[in-house]
A protein has these predicted regions:
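Negatively charged
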Residues: 2-104
């Protein structure tokens, strides 16, 4: 799924609940430069085998909400891997209202 939607500048919404991702190991830059994307619900994806989420949401400047409640990958402990400079992104763009994870 690496680069799958990369550069889809007009992509505003996508539902991925029918995707079988049980064997996917690379989701790097999957939504890179999806500048119109506002909400992303990845809670239905099976991510147990994913080992690369670098830049997953890089340059998604309109993104306001991300739901990754069922993401099952140790990489979530490092949010800077899928949202580079995660603190800077929130402060610079101020558009992200929330990231829901399974971790507390």
């Amino acid at each position: 799924m690496k680069n799958m939607f990369r550069g889809c500048l007009s992509l505003k919404k996508i539902e991925l609940f029918k995707f079988d991702t049980s064997n996917v190991n690379d989701m790097s830059y999957m939504f890179y430069q999806c500048e119109s994307l506002k909400r992303m619900d990845l809670s239905k994806l099976n991510t147990i085998n994913v080992d690369n989420i670098n830049g997953l949401f890089s340059e998604c400047i309109s993104l306001k909400f991300i739901d990754i409640t069922t993401f099952r990958t140790r990489l979530l402990l490092q949010p800077e891997r899928f949202i580079p400079d995660v603190k800077g992104l929130i402060y610079k763009h101020k558009s992200i209202k929330g990231i829901i994870t399974c971790y507390k």
